[in-house]
Amino acid sequence: MRVLGIDPGSRITGYGIIEKIGNRLVHVDNGAIHTDSHREFALRLHKIYEGLSRVIEEYRPDAMAVEQVFLAHNAQSALKLGQARGAAIVAGVSAGLPVSEYTAMQVKQAVVGYGHARKEQVQQMVKSLLNLPEIAQADASDALAVAVCHANSAVMKSVLRSIR
């Protein structure tokens, strides 16, 4: 199963792609889509949509996982972040991908085993799980963590279905 994880942002949207092969997690790619904060906001949303659409077309993931971000410094920031999430989700849905959403606490729990883990702990565990020496951008690291969360959650959902 190939998973595209997304860490949405109106200025920087991180993405990370992993593959679950048996019980191993394999890093495929990661990066970020940068938008110009001086451009019209609708054009920035379009850049997020187009950028993720290209990533989806190139890597052909089986699923998309998006972090639910609800912390913002003010109402305007929260609205912009929600719109960036929407652009990312529409890119996935337009490509026919199932889209799942996870809170930051769920991601931390799945990656580190502790829902209140610090950002550095999550980044360190992502590097360890994916056998990476470094991850260039924090946004990409967060996106990889979301992908790991989804891959592990999908396995658990499958196990629970087989028990029932």
From Swiss-Prot:
InterPro entries: RNaseH-like_sf, RNaseH_sf, X-over_junc_endoDNase_Mg_BS, X-over_junc_endoDNase_RuvC
Claim: Cell membrane is one of the keywords in the record: no
GO terms under cellular component: cytoplasm; Holliday junction resolvase complex
The record's free-text note on cofactor binding: Binds 2 Mg(2+) ion per subunit.
EC number: 3.1.21.10
Example GO BP: DNA recombination
Single GO molecular function: DNA binding
Ranges that cross the membrane: none
Protein keywords: Cytoplasm, DNA damage, DNA recombination, DNA repair, DNA-binding, Endonuclease, Hydrolase, Magnesium, Metal-binding, Nuclease
Compartment(s) where it occurs, according to its Swiss-Prot or TrEMBL record: Cytoplasm
Catalysed reactions, as listed in the record: Endonucleolytic cleavage at a junction such as a reciprocal single-stranded crossover between two homologous DNA duplexes (Holliday junction)
Entry cofactors: Mg(2+)
Residues reported to bind Mg(2+) 2: 67
Binding site for Mg(2+) 1: 7, 139
Classification via PANTHER family: CROSSOVER JUNCTION ENDODEOXYRIBONUCLEASE RUVC (PTHR30194:SF3)
Role of this protein: The RuvA-RuvB-RuvC complex processes Holliday junction (HJ) DNA during genetic recombination and DNA repair. Endonuclease that resolves HJ intermediates. Cleaves cruciform DNA by making single-stranded nicks across the HJ at symmetrical positions within the homologous arms, yielding a 5'-phosphate and a 3'-hydroxyl group; requires a central core of homology in the junction. The consensus cleavage sequence is 5'-(A/T)TT(C/G)-3'. Cleavage occurs on the 3'-side of the TT dinucleotide at the point of strand exchange.
Subunit and partners: Homodimer which binds Holliday junction (HJ) DNA. The HJ becomes 2-fold symmetrical on binding to RuvC with unstacked arms; it has a different conformation from HJ DNA in complex with RuvA. In the full resolvosome a probable DNA-RuvA(4)-RuvB(12)-RuvC(2) complex forms which resolves the HJ.
This protein's name: Crossover junction endodeoxyribonuclease RuvC
Native organism: Geobacter sulfurreducens (strain ATCC 51573 / DSM 12127 / PCA)
Lineage: Bacteria, Pseudomonadati, Thermodesulfobacteriota, Desulfuromonadia, Geobacterales
